[in-house]
């Protein structure tokens, strides 16, 4: 250990690295045998086999095995014997062929090893590691610990691969848009004004303009439209966006999107360009050829068949609407649902009889809880027996005619062993309930192929949806989406020229053609309840721009974090972001957000009214 700590003491006097790095650790292959190389990295693991020291040296590219023994490499042996996990070292040595018995097919460098002629210690570890970083360690580390010591977490192979994958995706986006399609990258402001876009804004007081506030952008939407008015034609940006909203696994208060806007292009042309972009990303990053064009579903078809507007089509389990069959049913729950303007739908589950018991469907069961969380009051069911007859609760069986029974079996394609789960009530609740059950059952039954890639467009969204809490219409996407030209006579029921790209049940991109005429934009503002004065106050700059020759235009934005999450096979976007926030919107590494000096608040002419609970 004497030489080790002597080396540490000399670090302060070491002004430069002794030798240029010749390779990254993970790059070395058989073709490099015989070369003398210099590597830098961290000790991933150290092993002593009969007096011979083996080190796994790690950098962002991977791992390579380093060997030091007292006979062949006496100059490096003493220091090699003193090294520990996560020490930072410089190693110079010869690339040699590994002996047959020590070949390691699990790593790309597994055919070679480095005989270390020289080892320099660049830095040590002075505190006990909060968790093991080594790629050989399989312990499950608590996420809060990983986020607090993110600099250690990012050294781990999985995280290093994820961050590099993210870089590859962004690089592919830039290359295709610039080199193939002629887009230009333009930065838009981070400090802007607060505009109603759905979620809460993050707001910042202005010191030089007391009483006035900036907002961080929820998206570059308005600026990119103004860029089209400015003649920029094909714009893109890897944009940082901010939304003060409740968080979940695939949401963050600050996130990144690929933002695009194009002038003089139809909806069809925009979709085709984006299919080629996405296909290029998959081929470049994943080596996967995607068949073009992608399938399309209208919003109405997606809701009818899957109960949601972002269906996972890797498995079937499609919903069946039997409202017309049940409108005259003797079963009051079904009959009343239809009479009150609602629907009755069925989720048919092959082999459901065998795997799903009545206990799970009734109150207290897991499927009942799933339905309740979606707003359903209960679950009705029919089981198809081996003889083709049905089993269900008496209230349904006694009030189902033979004709209705046969129509249900025929429409659902139900065979012996099928379980039919019913949803009845308002359309939104029924669809949400059966969508959740569909996803839960697909996971339980192993119906989802994790290697399958299903991309599809959902098109023809409604322009507006009803906000029951505020008792008004609101834009389903945003109020700058252009209505379908055939529906201009009735904006309230109009379809939008909008399109979402869905990847294995996740919305990864959403866009639309935009309104580019002032009078249409003003009509949309009026439809969502904005008075002319409010519209002028919040969006006057956009309306003014529309007076000066605005081209037809449209665009799309991709959620970069979510797209990379799916590429990486992760379940949370926190695992593909270098420094994410928790679900409580905190950075555990820096302990942000934090308090500030009263002096700073005074300079900003603000004060906090928050009083901590005693």
Curated annotation (Swiss-Prot):
The keyword Transport does not apply. InterPro entries: Aa-tRNA-synt_II (IPR004364), aa-tRNA-synth_II (IPR006195), aa-tRNA-synth_II/BPL/LPL (IPR045864), Asp-tRNA-ligase_1 (IPR004524), Asp-tRNA-ligase_1_N (IPR047089), Asp/Asn-tRNA-synth_IIb (IPR002312), AspRS_core (IPR047090), GAD-like_sf (IPR004115). One of its GO terms (cellular component) is cytoplasm. Keywords: Aminoacyl-tRNA synthetase, ATP-binding, Cytoplasm, Ligase, Nucleotide-binding, Protein biosynthesis. It is found in: Cytoplasm. Its EC number is 6.1.1.23. ATP binds at residues 243-245, 252, 507, 559-562. The keyword Ion transport does not apply. It comes from the Bacteria. SUPFAM superfamilies: Class II aaRS and biotin synthetases, GAD domain-like, Nucleic acid-binding proteins. Residues 221-224 are annotated as: Aspartate. It catalyses: tRNA(Asx) + L-aspartate + ATP = L-aspartyl-tRNA(Asx) + AMP + diphosphate. L-aspartate binds at residues 197, 243, 477, 514. Its main location: cytoplasm. Homodimer. Aspartyl-tRNA synthetase with relaxed tRNA specificity since it is able to aspartylate not only its cognate tRNA(Asp) but also tRNA(Asn). Reaction proceeds in two steps: L-aspartate is first activated by ATP to form Asp-AMP and then transferred to the acceptor end of tRNA(Asp/Asn). This is Aspartate--tRNA(Asp/Asn) ligase. It comes from Trichormus variabilis (strain ATCC 29413 / PCC 7937) (Anabaena variabilis).
């Amino acid at each position: 250990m004497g030489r080790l700590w002597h080396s540490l003491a000399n670090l302060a006097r070491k002004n430069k690295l002794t030798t240029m790095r010749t390779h990254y650790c993970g790059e070395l292959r058989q073709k490099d045998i015989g070369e003398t190389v210099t590597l830098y990295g961290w000790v991933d693991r150290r092993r002593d086999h009969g007096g011979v020291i083996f080190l796994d040296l790690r950098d962002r590219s991977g791992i390579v095995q380093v060997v030091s023994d007292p006979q062949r490499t006496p100059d490096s042996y003493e220091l090699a014997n003193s090294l520990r996990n996560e020490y930072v070292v410089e190693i110079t040595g010869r690339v040699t062929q590994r002996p047959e018995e020590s070949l390691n097919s699990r790593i790309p460098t597994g055919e070679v090893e480095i005989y270390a002629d020289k080892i320099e210690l660049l830095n040590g570890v002075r505190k006990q590691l909060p968790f093991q970083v080594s790629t050989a360690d399989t312990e499950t580390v608590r996420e809060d610990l990983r986020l607090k010591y993110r600099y250690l977490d990012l050294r781990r192979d999985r995280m290093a691969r994820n961050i590099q994958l993210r870089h590859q995706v962004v690089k592919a986006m830039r290359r295709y848009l610039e080199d193939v399609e002629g887009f230009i990258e333009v930065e838009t402001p981070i400090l802007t004004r607060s505009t109603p876009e759905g979620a809460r804004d993050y707001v910042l007081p202005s010191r030089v303009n007391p009483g006035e506030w900036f907002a961080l952008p929820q998206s570059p939407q308005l600026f990119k439209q103004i860029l089209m008015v400015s003649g920029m034609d094909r714009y893109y940006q890897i944009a940082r966006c901010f939304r003060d909203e409740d968080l979940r696994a695939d949401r963050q208060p600050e996130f990144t999107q690929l933002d695009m806007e194009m002038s003089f292009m139809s909806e069809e042309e925009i979709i085709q360009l984006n299919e080629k972009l996405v296909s290029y990303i998959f081929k470049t990053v994943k080596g996967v050829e995607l068949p073009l064009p992608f399938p399309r579903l209208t919003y109405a078809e997606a809701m009818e068949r899957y109960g949601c507007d972002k269906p996972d089509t890797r498995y079937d389990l499609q919903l069946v609407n039997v409202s017309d069959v049940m409108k005259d049913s003797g079963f009051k729950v079904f009959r009343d649902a239809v009479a009150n303007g609602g629907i009755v739908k069925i989720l048919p589950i092959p082999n459901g009889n065998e795997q799903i018991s009545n206990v799970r469907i009734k109150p207290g069961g897991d499927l009942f809880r799933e339905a309740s969380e979606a707003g359903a009051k209960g679950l009705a069911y029919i089981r198809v027996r081996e003889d083709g007859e049905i089993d269900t609760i008496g209230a349904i069986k006694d009030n189902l005619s033979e004709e209705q029974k046969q129509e249900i079996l025929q429409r659902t394609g139900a065979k012996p062993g099928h379980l039919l789960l019913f949803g009845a009530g308002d359309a939104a609740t029924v669809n949400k309930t059966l969508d959740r059950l569909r996803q839960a059952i697909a996971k339980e039954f192993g119906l989802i192929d994790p290697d399958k890639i299903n991309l599809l467009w959902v098109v023809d969204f409604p322009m507006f949806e009803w906000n029951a809490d505020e008792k008004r219409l609101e834009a389903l996407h945003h109020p700058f989406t252009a209505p379908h030209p055939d529906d201009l006579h009735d904006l309230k029921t109009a379809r939008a020229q909008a399109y979402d790209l869905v990847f294995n049940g996740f919305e990864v991109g959403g866009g639309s053609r935009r309104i580019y005429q002032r009078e249409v934009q003003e009509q949309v503002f009026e439809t969502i309840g904005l008075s002319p004065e409010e519209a002028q106050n919040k969006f006057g700059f956009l309306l003014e721009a529309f007076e000066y020759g605005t081209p037809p235009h449209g665009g799309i934005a991709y959620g970069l974090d979510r797209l990379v999450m799916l590429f990486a096979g992760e379940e949370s976007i926190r695992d593909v972001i270098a420094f994410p926030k928790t679900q409580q919107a905190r950075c555990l590494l820096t302990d942000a957000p934090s308090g500030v000096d009263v002096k700073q608040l005074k300079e900003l002419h603000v004060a906090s009214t928050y009083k901590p609970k005693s």
